[in-house]
Structures are given as C-alpha cells and as structure tokens.
Amino acid sequence: MAVKPHGGTLIDRVLKGPAREEALKRAKELPRLFLDRWEASDLELIANGAFSPLAGFMNKADYENVVDNMRLADGTVWTIPIVLGVASGEAGSLAPGREAALCAEDGELLGLIKVEEIYDYDRRREAEKVYKTTDEAHPGVKRVYERAQYLLGGEISLISRRRPGQFPEMYLDPSETRRIFAEKGWKRVAAFQTRNPIHRAHEYLLKCALEICDGLFVNPLVGETKSDDVPAAVRVECYNVLLSRYFPADRVFLSAFPAAMRYAGPREAVFHAIVRKNYGATHFIVGRDHAGVGSYYGAYDAQLIFDNFEPEELGITPLFFEHAFYCRTCGGMASRKTCPHGGEDRVFLSGTRVREMLSAGEMPPEEFTRREVAEVLVRYYAK
C-alpha cells in the first residue's frame, strides 16, 4: 500500500479543460501580481501536490504557527513558511474574497489566488526561528529581509505550467512518481535530496539505503540556489553518469525537484522529508549538515530536529547517516561507526580544496569522487 500524502490527500490545484478556460477569461479583469522565480516555483509545487496539504500560500494563523511551533494551525507538522509577499502599493488593489492574477516576471499568466487575508509580519522573528540567525549573510535570511512588506494568504489555482528547456523529462508531479513506484512494485522507497554533485561519500549512503529499501529515488533540487553552487545542468550530467555506471538501473529513479533552496538546515530537512513523502517515498536520507550553509548549524542538527515529532506525525522514516569517508586501511568507504582507524588513514577533502583542484584541471583522488564525475566537473570549471 502506498504511503499516504501529508495530511491525507494529494492536493491538485492544476486547472484543466473548461475550468481553465473560464479562469483565463476572469484573469483579464483581475489585478495582477508579479511573482519572482522562487514564488513561481512554490506556486507550481502547491498546485501539483508536492506541498500537500497546502492548497495555497499561508494565511496568518498558519504562518505564525509554522514560525513558532513548526506546525500548521491545525497541528499538522510543517516547518517552512510558504508565503507570497505583496508590496503596500499592490495590497491596495486587493480585497479578501476577491481574486488576483498571478504572473511571472515576464508577464505570463501563471494562475489565480483567492485572497483570504493580507497581513503584516516580523521578518527578524522569522529569521531567528526558521534560520536560527539574523545574519544577512545567510542566503535564506537575506531573502526574508528582501521580501515585500506584507504577506498574502489564499488558495491558488494554476493555469499555466512553465517547463524549462533543460531535461523537461525529469520534471514529474507527485501523482506521476507515485504511479511509477507502484508500477515498479516498490513498497519501500528511499529518497535522496541533493543540490551538489554526488561524490563517493554520498554514493555510500545511497547504497546503504538501497540495502534496506526496494528502490532509490534520487530527487535533486534544481530551483534557485546560491550563485556559487554547481548549475543544475552540470549536476544532472554528474548524476546520470554515476547512476548509469554504478547503480542497478531497475532499482534507482532520477527526477527533478524544482524548488528553491532555503538553506534552513534542520527545518529544511524535515520539510524535504515531508515533500518526498508526497512524491511517494517511505524513507528519507539525512546526512551531515543537511540543507546547511556556512557554519550556521551543527553537523547533526538536521537529524536531531526529528526528535521533536512522533513517527506517525511525519509518516516517513528518516535514515540518519554519519559523515562518510574512504579509509585506506579498511580499503573502502566507511564512517566512524564502522571504522576503527585514525585520521591519517581517512581521505577527507574540503569543498574549497575540491573546487581548487577542479579549477586547476586536476582530478580529485578516486577515493573522493568517481573519475567519470570528476571529468564532468573539470570540463565545467575549465569554462
């Protein structure tokens, strides 16, 4: 039996047929709000059910409960605010109970929102609670501080879907991945979230998960990330070359997660798990410093946060892993749970050192990354 969506029902707010045509007509007479890429991706992920049980951008009660208690107003576990900012000038044209058209930055109509409420909020409080810092150098905090003056809550409907030019076949809705897992006969599905190329340490975690699950769902985030993160197209090439050569084809499935990266560390780990549950996963891999950035979070804070919730509240099983490394004496990948040897036997490379090597055209050691993956990255850094 497939895992139930979060909240019990997979949301579908994508308009089709006559309902879509009618919405297109209404939109011509409505006030227009322009969404940036982050908000547009949230709109689509609400509509296709990835953010179930949300049916729209959060109202004040849900927003404040999520910020303070990591739950929606009805008690459902939810850790990240999903909100739509609106400037004071725009707010004047809106009224509760009325609709507004939601448009992309280039003016394309994306959908509609039925305005429930327009409310003020405390940016600093959100930063402290959600990101554990008020430092504007944190990319998530910076985003909060730059957001518009008010927030707009209300149910949405999606009219137009924007498919990217790159790897459109990888963009699947939760209803589609759930069907695929069922067709494959997978009852236990381990999901893996990543915004980086997969190196040997990640490969080790994935194969450990595959030992206890029927299938592996590799679901890289391909929405907005930091400017110095490896671009999605390069990462997808890395994923394809690794999975095709070092994993059984019938036990792994690769699909894109078109969300923006929040860099909210522990809270985002829970959020990522819930979303993958909606995609049909039963287990979720949580490694060292999941969704972290800089030194804002402890190495295993993203695992400890799960202690705040009962297993039945989450409905997905987290798989916690220690930081993995190659041990020369063991002759393979290990962690401090399985390896008795000292630091001199362990191959560790910092991200900074790896980028320096790749930029210089040097191949990182095989103990750190597969040669095929390194070759893709060397070509990218050589540009």
UniProtKB/Swiss-Prot annotation:
GO terms for molecular function: ATP binding; sulfate adenylyltransferase (ATP) activity. GO terms for biological process: hydrogen sulfide biosynthetic process; sulfate assimilation. Belongs to the sulfate adenylyltransferase family. Disulfide bonds: none annotated. It comes from the Bacteria. It comes from Pelotomaculum thermopropionicum (strain DSM 13744 / JCM 10971 / SI). CDD domains: ATPS. The gene is sat. Pathway: Sulfur metabolism; hydrogen sulfide biosynthesis; sulfite from sulfate: step 1/3. PANTHER family: PTHR43509, SULFATE ADENYLYLTRANSFERASE. The keyword Transport does not apply. Its EC number is 2.7.7.4. Keywords: ATP-binding, Nucleotide-binding, Nucleotidyltransferase, Transferase. Pfam families: ATP-sulfurylase (PF01747), PUA_2 (PF14306). It catalyses: sulfate + ATP + H(+) = adenosine 5'-phosphosulfate + diphosphate. This is Sulfate adenylyltransferase.
